[in-house]
């Protein structure tokens, strides 16, 4: 059901009740609780207190509604068929256990691709609204400077737990600085603390903090992955928020929902796997990635959620630049350099252009001057 609401995603687990509760602090127990809930309202109020974020959220929502109102054929003509998003993992660890393996990271990447493309093995026997979101993820092969990378940064830290203050996103506070948000999905892995699974920043916030944070115990489906959140669906849920999806119950009662027309209204989050649970005169979609069911219970995004996510990549969308990012382009490894003979830094020995060509050489461009520089393209007044 579609009833406007604006909520930021800050997802955590606690060990009580099928209702919203008080979030534990980072200093509290790190034990894995049996259920999850969300302290999103406090974070939402905090961010919406800033005029810039509030205004940007309004603009994004207006653009989303314009996109949703277009005929399907018109949307199809404007959108990329499948959007591939480069991902950089920032693994910030205080000990060897937190420094999760490449294999565990790759398992998470595969789960994201399976879930967003509806290739997950548990996709059968679910709601008819289920859809392929046509969003894929690739491990970054080029860093912001165009250098080859494996897309995984490993940063040793003295910080025992980061909480939700975004300190993990800054090297100055023991974390790792974000790569440009217009070209990459930043995915931080760390010990969040306080029983928190992870959190995401909705579109419209600062580029310096844009991305997803997941506790090292809830990434992928191997290694440190811990039941009942050991199938990588925490990341699927959080990336959903990063792509502008709200919780399916709208963080409220039957009078609030998620701005998606084909998700049934619900009066609260669902935990465990409450298949068949009813509220608001309909059956709750507990299998939706944006509810709070256990990982094994989740298996779909809807067609309406797909449209909402795809609006971000449409002309004028907040994340449109990601659709053309070269963060996953084949890296130049042999014979790299500038191959354009008109560039200042032309390399006659280069066999593969690495994107470094510079056409702004300064010098004297007057051929009659004593210090004429034939390579100069911009006169420096000398």
Identify what each model region corresponds to.
Residues 1-5:
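Positively charged n-region of N-terminal signal peptides that target proteins for export
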Residues 7-15:
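Bacterial N-terminal signal peptides
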Residues 18-116:
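Primarily auto-inhibitory N-terminal propeptides
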Residues 25-59, 181, 253, 273, ...:
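Functionally engaged cysteine thiol sites
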Residues 27-28, 79-81, 87-97, 102-143, ...:
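Extracellular (secreted or membrane-anchored) zinc-dependent metallopeptidases
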Residues 44, 260, 279, 344, ...:
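Secreted/processed peptides and extracellular or luminal domains of membrane proteins
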Residues 146-148:
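Short active-site-adjacent helix-start/loop capping segments
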Residues 310, 323, 327-382:
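Primarily marks secretory-pathway-exposed extracellular/lumenal segments that are disulfide-
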